[in-house]
Amino acid sequence: VMAERPTSTTLSLYLWAAVVAHDGTTTLAPPITLPASTRAHPLTIDATGALAADLLGHVASAPPPLPLWHAAQDSLVTEPLAMHGDGTPPCQLAHPHSSAHVDMNGDCLADLFLVCDAGRGRLSYQVWTARRDAPRTYDLARVGDLPPGTGALSFADMNRDGTIDVVFPACERDRCYIHIAYNEQMPLCAPERRGVWGARNASAERCRDAAQLCAPDDAFVLRDGADLVRIPIDALTSDRRLLLVDDIGASQPVPVRVGDYNLDGYPDL
């Protein structure tokens, strides 16, 4: 549980651990107080792949690099997360932010997509890919800027190519848009791309074998900046009136909800 006082600059964190009795009934143990975080809420991730929830964020009493609240016996302890970059300044999580633990390079391991405070009201992002051979270790893969007025980010496969894309609203002056940043990776290998007896044709373009769907593509391209797909909200609504409210009395922005609402196999908004 994350709790915030109106005048506080930190979040108080409490953990009520579930206790399962021999008869299968579940109760909650007394709360454990965790080290407080900054107002940028921690992100729940599984950093080790052990199906145990960890927290990633800024500890209020620690310097900017992102530490990990890691499960240890009956508590969560803070420890550094191994993040190998290229000298890019560490991400200062925005408040609020919509960072995610999601696979961005197609290796079936969840990576870190962090939404960072770039100063002067601007947002940027950093993508850190997980290492299969080293749990709790991430390599910086992509950095970029988000458009002015960007709202909460959502993640979904918008074009059904098997990769996770980024969807978000952004408003400029009096007009709002839905933005889609497509995640482009190597395609599936087609039968004609194989040589005799099923051997791969050396001259064929790079592709992902259907029998090896978790092969990473570290050359993935996230179409941001000028390559973003921008869809005007008023173009989606046709002659129907859509009331855009920029203040609904909540401190957290409302994200775009992605789902297949008409059951045709394609993502809807």
Question: Which residues are covered by each model-predicted region?
Answer:
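Beta-propeller-forming repeat regions
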Residues: 1-269
